């Protein structure tokens, strides 16, 4: 009996900049389709937003504050029925810096 996990590769991508994230997704989709595998996604996952509030001055002016935020964009993809060529091509793929990749087989 075959399991579902061997019939697909689940890829989760994270980045601070959505533009480089979309470029990385496009490279993975092109690579998977060129090797004959199907692609489901990319599915945009909710963006994590971390907000930080700090005082502008060190000693006085409590009312004067500055706010910063950090956004983490995420995408989820499934590569359906991957071949050995697909796995090799994904292993050799160089993605832009700043993109975190999680692969589950």
UniProtKB/Swiss-Prot annotation:
SUPFAM superfamilies: Ribosomal protein S10
Family matches, as InterPro entries: Ribosomal_uS10 (IPR001848), Ribosomal_uS10_CS (IPR018268), Ribosomal_uS10_dom (IPR027486), Ribosomal_uS10_dom_sf (IPR036838)
The keyword Ribonucleoprotein is annotated on this UniProt entry: yes
Cellular component GO terms held in the UniProt record: ribonucleoprotein complex; ribosome
Superkingdom classification of source: Bacteria
UniProt keyword terms in alphabetical order: Ribonucleoprotein, Ribosomal protein
Assembly behavior: Part of the 30S ribosomal subunit.
UniProt similarity note: Belongs to the universal ribosomal protein uS10 family.
Family matches, as NCBIfam families: PRK00596.1 (NF001861), rpsJ_bact (TIGR01049)
Protein name in UniProt: Small ribosomal subunit protein uS10
Lineage: Bacteria, Pseudomonadati, Thermodesulfobacteriota, Desulfovibrionia, Desulfovibrionales
